[in-house]
Amino acid sequence: MLYIGIDLGTSAVKLLLMDSEGNIRNIVSREYPLYFPHPGWSEQKPEDWYEQTMEGIRELLKDADKSQVAGISFGGQMHGLVILDEKDQVIRPAILWNDGRTTEECDYLNNVIGKEKLSEYTANTVSYTHLRAHE
């Protein structure tokens, strides 16, 4: 049996193919660009993630018996924001964990609601209020 691990990182997607004994059969890394449209902003195109992941899987499995793949696991960036429309289509570049455009809104909400309570309600940092006000 073979297993695939996928790590969607900030600068690249890393893929690993491992057998049931824990032997690494193949490792692939596919880079994608970061975009900085304004100072302090950090974005990526989810389409780039998808394309590089799919290409990476093809490369990872090129010499493997695909019928032996028994499992796949994913990991990725935390606290990114991917906005979808009502048809689950991406409508703008993803706002990444290291983006600083929402500092003012985050400070306001943390002061008004309280950082602990806000985290309890949302289980994430505040970033969507900036979009409502500016996009």
Please provide the spans of the model-predicted regions.
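Carbohydrate-associated surface elements
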Residues: 99
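Hinge/lid segment of periplasmic solute-binding proteins
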Residues: 103-114
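Short, glycine/acidic-enriched loop or turn micro-motifs at the edges of active sites
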Residues: 10, 102, 135
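N-terminal glycine/serine-rich phosphate-binding loop of ATP-dependent small-molecule kinases
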Residues: 1-92
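Short glycine/proline- and acidic residue-enriched helix-loop micro-motifs
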Residues: 115-125
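Acidic-residue sensor for enzyme active/binding pockets
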Residues: 43, 105, 135
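Glycine- and other small-residue-rich loops at beta-strand/loop junctions that grip anionic moieties
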Residues: 95
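Conserved small/polar residues in nucleotide/adenosyl-binding loops
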Residues: 129-135
